[in-house]
Amino acid sequence: MSFDEGLYEWAKEALEPLGIVSLRRMMGAAVLYLDGTIFAVVEDEIWFKADADSAAIWDAEGCARFTFTDKDGKVETMNYRRAPTDVYDDVEAMQRWASLAVEAGLRSAAKKRPKKPKGAPPV
């Protein structure tokens, strides 16, 4: 994986009306956030966050699931989908698909239990 700074700049510019896009570099790629909500991974292409609620929409568009081979040679998938080709040159498409990904990111964050402070007694 190699991070494409140009894709980040494009996403940042296209999504400016929706909020602030930020990134965190990770293993040669970058995780993108919109107003603090994870919504994509960028390497040499964009992979949008997805979930069971949005799977049918991504499937209908033919957006492949993110897959990788783990250290034991097993192929694994993650809840990210390859961006439709129109997001690379159409602001409205970028906003539409990124919004769907942000919704998945918000649902994912809502499902996670808050971490207990260190030293807190068991509940």
Whereabouts are the PLM-identified features?
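Charge-dense, helix-prone N-terminal extensions
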Residues: 1-123
